[in-house]
């Protein structure tokens, strides 16, 4: 697919994936022969960041599930062609904070949209590109939401306002994806201490370098 290495990090809200990435980045940059680029979805480039603001705005409570999905898909396409693919072509490692699996878990399992249709839209938007490795940071929904509530630095967004059962469906959607694609998606127990999660993650990534 490309000269570089594409890694996505996924998980339900409050799993701590961003904290793990911050700790691991210095290690990765020491051992990877090219640049290590981090980016996020939705966002990463100007157009996609503008779409992100619309999606996450807490005032947009009237947003329909399909509208939400299509906004994510539009942001994904722009981000991929403008930033991700050029970096991969240059031989760099790209680490994406969320990618295609988020749509299946959140809009598919969480919102109840047809998961085959979500997968088709993902494929259409990405021309079939998938991560070489997906790290799934898994934590039960109650723990994840408690972490969000305790994090005073994190700005609350529209998705944080969803009820517990929505978050539980999202988590199950992720677990189903991991079961369906075990070679690509590696589950990490994110209920452990940060140090333990970091080491588990590092062992997985090392096998792909």
Curated annotation (Swiss-Prot):
Instruction: Identify one Gene Ontology CC term for this UniProt entry.
Output: cytosol
Keywords in UniProt for this one? ATP-binding, Kinase, Nucleotide biosynthesis, Nucleotide-binding, Transferase
Q: Which residues bind ATP?
A: 11-18
Q: Which GO terms describe its molecular function?
A: ATP binding; dTMP kinase activity
GO BP, one annotated term: dTDP biosynthetic process
Enzyme Commission designation: 2.7.4.9
Q: Which top-rank group of organisms is this from?
A: Bacteria
Task: Describe the reaction catalysed, as an equation.
Answer: dTMP + ATP = dTDP + ADP
Answer yes or no on keyword ATP-binding: yes
> Which family does the record assign?
Belongs to the thymidylate kinase family.
The record's listing under HAMAP family reads: Thymidylate_kinase (MF_00165)
| Entry-linked PANTHER family | THYMIDYLATE KINASE, UMP-CMP KINASE 2, MITOCHONDRIAL
Q: What does this protein do?
A: Phosphorylation of dTMP to form dTDP in both de novo and salvage pathways of dTTP synthesis.
Output this protein's name.
Thymidylate kinase
Native organism = Streptococcus thermophilus (strain ATCC BAA-250 / LMG 18311)
State the taxonomy lineage.
Answer: Bacteria, Bacillati, Bacillota, Bacilli, Lactobacillales
């Amino acid at each position: 697919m490309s000269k570089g290495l594409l890694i996505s990090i996924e998980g339900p809200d409050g799993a701590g994936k961003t904290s793990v990435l911050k700790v691991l980045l210095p290690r990765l940059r020491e051992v990877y022969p090219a640049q290590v680029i981090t980016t996020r979805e939705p966002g990463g480039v100007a157009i996609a960041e503008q779409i992100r603001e619309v999606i996450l705005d807490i005032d947009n409570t009237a947003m329909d599930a399909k509208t939400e999905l299509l906004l994510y898909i539009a942001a994904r396409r722009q981000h991929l062609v403008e930033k991700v693919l050029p970096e991969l072509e240059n031989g760099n490692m790209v680490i994406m904070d969320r990618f295609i699996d988020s749509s299946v878990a959140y809009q598919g399992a969480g919102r109840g949209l047809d998961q085959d249709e979500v997968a088709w839209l993902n494929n259409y938007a990405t021309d079939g590109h998938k991560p070489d490795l997906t790290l799934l940071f898994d934590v039960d929904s109650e723990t994840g939401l408690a972490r969000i509530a305790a994090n005073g630095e994190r700005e609350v967004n529209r998705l944080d306002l969803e009820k517990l059962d929505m978050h539980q469906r999202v988590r199950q959607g992720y677990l189903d994806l991991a079961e369906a694609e075990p070679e690509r998606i590696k589950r990490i127990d994110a209920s452990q201490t940060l140090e333990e999660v970091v080491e588990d993650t590092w062992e997985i990534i090392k096998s792909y370098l």
